[in-house]
Curated annotation (Swiss-Prot):
This is Asparagine--tRNA ligase. GO terms for biological process: asparaginyl-tRNA aminoacylation. The keyword Thylakoid does not apply. It catalyses: tRNA(Asn) + L-asparagine + ATP = L-asparaginyl-tRNA(Asn) + AMP + diphosphate + H(+). Signal peptide: none annotated. Keywords: Aminoacyl-tRNA synthetase, ATP-binding, Cytoplasm, Ligase, Nucleotide-binding, Protein biosynthesis. It is found in: Cytoplasm. It comes from Enterobacter sp. (strain 638). InterPro entries: Aa-tRNA-synt_II (IPR004364), aa-tRNA-synth_II (IPR006195), aa-tRNA-synth_II/BPL/LPL (IPR045864), Asn-tRNA-ligase (IPR004522), Asp/Asn-tRNA-synth_IIb (IPR002312), NA-bd_OB-fold (IPR012340), NA-bd_OB_tRNA (IPR004365). The lineage of its organism: Bacteria, Pseudomonadati, Pseudomonadota, Gammaproteobacteria, Enterobacterales.
Length: 466
């Protein structure tokens, strides 16, 4: 007997009258007076469950079937038939059913068949994948990740796995998690009374990475086109719907590329993955449009067909100053654009995705290439209608003397970045890249308002459960 996913049955990939087996969990059970039970069985392979029609002639009908409740795990064998009812094209006429796991107490089962609040689901994160929404998020997350890998592979990029433990602060902001095996009750001290990290596991201070970019640059300067994709960490005490202490980042780096090159790459990449999710996860996206955000599908369709606008930071500030809109955060040249500024530009002024370029150097990182005006750097943000910034990137500073001067300006010790400086000493090239926060991308695609609900087990200030 062939075991098939529920998706194959519902999507017509199994011939009518063929007997197959599906394995999954009961979503609902209803019984008719005619001695027939209808089980909705899901296995996570698609959004909808398959209906299994079970006749009371089965030998374990009274002992097992009539006691099944939401969450019980079952193996159902049956014949695929065209469904006479609404809601599905095919169903199973069961010939056998095996219960592999019961729910101990249906009355206290945390995932009972009713709508649960998002806040409640975070408290039972180990069970929330069983819900419609989190299951759909998981499938969309998978499809987006696979589409990103596929896009870069087709473009000739190599995936590089950069370290999670580092001694470098990529952003220079100092919001890093320290990694240490020192005894907190008996810390070694230097003669000056400071913690002696020479005695630590790595012989120096070590941290969880905030970005794979610096390491990625080393491989871009040898393989030409690379990308990193993995977890990153920020010890930022932010309890907002847009922040996580642990999240995933995608970061391409391209040798011999300028800012315009990677702006074009970002546009092509986003359109590629949005098109993929619309085509491959139509069932889940239909759910998000019906239950979470009515604009979810239409937003992506508009994005895929839109031409990106491009504007210099200086011109963007002028637009915002003259627009007559009352902003909560004042806007002037030299300030970093807030979410409300970004969304005004994308949603009201340009009515399209926008690439803002050439930001003031004082609000950007040390590694961004200084422009000829000496005041701005070759940095960019991609702003999307409905969310604001979705990508941040830059051309990297390839001139050693300028890089050293920028480090000095920002109080960084060049000795801590000797290996990074070597890239400028041995065959330096112009190169550029960007970073995409994966959870923000998923939130944008699905319309889910909080990034805590698009990652399996969110890590936030004072929360590291599960």
């Amino acid at each position: 007997m062939s075991v098939v996913p529920v998706a194959d049955v519902l999507q017509g990939r199994v011939a009518v009258d063929q007997e197959v087996t599906v394995r999954g969990w009961v979503r609902t059970r209803r019984d008719s007076k005619a001695g027939i039970s209808f089980l909705a069985v899901y296995d996570g392979s698609c959004f909808d469950p398959v209906q299994a029609v079970i006749n009371n002639s089965l030998p374990n009908y009274n002992d097992d079937v009539l006691h099944l409740t939401t969450g019980c795990s079952v193996i159902v064998t049956g014949v695929v038939v065209a469904s006479p009812g609404q809601g599905q094209s095919f169903e199973l006429q069961a010939t056998a059913i095996e219960v592999t796991g019961w729910v101990e107490d249906p009355d206290t089962y945390p995932m009972a068949a009713k709508r649960h609040s998002i806040e409640y689901l975070r408290e039972v994160a180990h069970l929330r994948p069983r819900t419609n929404m989190i299951g759909a998020v998981a499938r969309v997350r998978h499809t987006l990740a696979q589409a990103l890998h596929r896009f870069f592979d087709e473009q000739g990029y190599f995936w590089v796995s950069t370290p999670l433990i580092t001694a470098s602060d990529t952003e220079g902001a100092g919001e890093m998690f320290r990694v240490s095996t020192l005894d907190l009750e008996n810390l070694p001290r230097t003669p000056e009374g400071k913690v002696d990290f020479d005695k630590d596991f790595f012989g120096k201070e070590a941290f969880l990475t905030v970005s794979g970019q610096l390491n990625g640059e080393t491989y871009a300067c040898a393989l030409s086109k690379i990308y990193t994709f993995g977890p990153t960490f920020r010890a930022e005490n932010s309890n907002t719907s847009r922040h996580l202490a642990e999240f995933w980042m995608l970061e391409p780096e391209v040798a011999f590329a300028n800012l315009n090159d990677v702006a074009g790459l970002a546009e092509a990449m986003l359109k590629y993955v949005f098109k993929a999710v619309l085509e491959e996860r139509a069932d889940d996206m239909k759910f998000f449009a019906e239950r979470v955000d009515s604009d979810a599908v239409a937003r992506l369709e508009r994005f895929v067909s839109a031409d990106f606008a491009q504007v210099d930071y200086t011109d963007a500030v002028a637009i915002l100053e003259k627009c007559g809109e009352k902003f909560e955060n004042p806007v002037y040249w030299g300030v970093d654009l807030s979410s409300e500024h970004e969304r005004y530009l994308a949603e009201k002024h340009f009515k399209a995705p926008v690439v803002v370029k050439n930001y003031p150097k004082d609000i950007k990182a040390f590694y961004m290439r200084l422009n000829e005006d000496g005041k701005t750097v070759a940095a960019m943000d991609v702003l999307a209608p409905g969310i604001g910034e979705i990508i941040g990137g830059s051309q990297r500073e390839e001139r050693l003397d300028v890089l050293d001067a920028r480090m000095e300006e920002m109080g960084l010790n060049p000795a801590d970045y000797s290996w990074y400086r070597d890239l400028r000493r041995y065959g330096t090239v112009p190169h550029s890249g960007f970073g995409l926060g994966f959870e923000r991308l998923i939130a944008y695609v699905t319309g889910v308002q909080n990034v805590r609900d698009v990652i399996a087990f969110p890590r936030t200030p004072r929360n590291a459960s599960f």
